[in-house]
């Protein structure tokens, strides 16, 4: 905050312009679906980052990992022993009557018990600084590519932040994603092929599909 307070209005505008130029050069966009047409828009970028301390992030990251494990245990139970249904914790009719429930998966047991390999949890922070999860996106979570590219743009616009402060990296996400997916391969290949399936260039998340495929 003190760093940005020390910048003049002209300096802030110049850095904002540099960030917008970087977004155009990097081709960062998303598709807005409107009636009758699809519109590609440049990614909106806030140059002032939301700061989370290492201590806070340690608690948040551990909580999210625990939450993802719990969600996988829930899915595994639903398709196997169904104890959570028998105990009445979750109404059976809601689960078994859902269009998303796949009876073909009953009795299945994926490697490492990983039904949901990626979880996109939407976090909010209240006025007391407490974090809450709004929802968990397990089927086709998207948005991580914008996080990685936001960091790259921030490095270009305000490189001083990365010289003067210890900031955790995020650019290794595609590699970690590949390693996780490769570990799930049923084949004993040294470097299994991992692909990203995409509906195509007109899909709203196509930028991310291409970004992750190239990064892996």
State the predicted function of each range.
Residues 1-216:
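Preference for protein termini
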């Amino acid at each position: 905050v003190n760093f940005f307070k020390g910048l003049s209005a002209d300096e802030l505008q110049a850095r904002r312009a540099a960030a917008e130029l970087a977004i155009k050069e990097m081709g960062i966009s998303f598709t807005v679906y409107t009636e009758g047409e699809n519109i590609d828009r440049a990614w909106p970028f806030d140059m002032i980052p939301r700061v989370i301390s290492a201590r806070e992030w340690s608690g948040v990251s551990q909580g999210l990992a625990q939450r993802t494990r719990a969600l996988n245990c829930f899915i595994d139970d639903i398709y196997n022993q169904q104890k959570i249904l028998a105990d009445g914790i979750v109404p059976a009719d809601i689960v078994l009557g859902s269009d998303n429930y796949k009876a073909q998966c009953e009795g299945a047991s994926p490697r490492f018990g990983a039904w949901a390999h990626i979880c996109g949890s939407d976090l909010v922070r209240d006025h007391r600084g407490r974090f809450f999860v709004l929802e968990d996106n397990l089927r086709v979570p998207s948005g991580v590519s914008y996080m990685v590219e936001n960091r790259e743009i921030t490095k270009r616009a305000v490189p001083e932040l990365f010289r003067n402060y210890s900031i955790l990296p995020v650019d290794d996400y595609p590699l970690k994603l590949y390693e996780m997916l490769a570990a799930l391969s049923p084949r004993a290949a040294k470097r299994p092929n991992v692909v990203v399936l995409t509906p195509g260039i007109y899909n709203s998340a196509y930028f991310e599909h291409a970004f992750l495929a190239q990064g892996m």
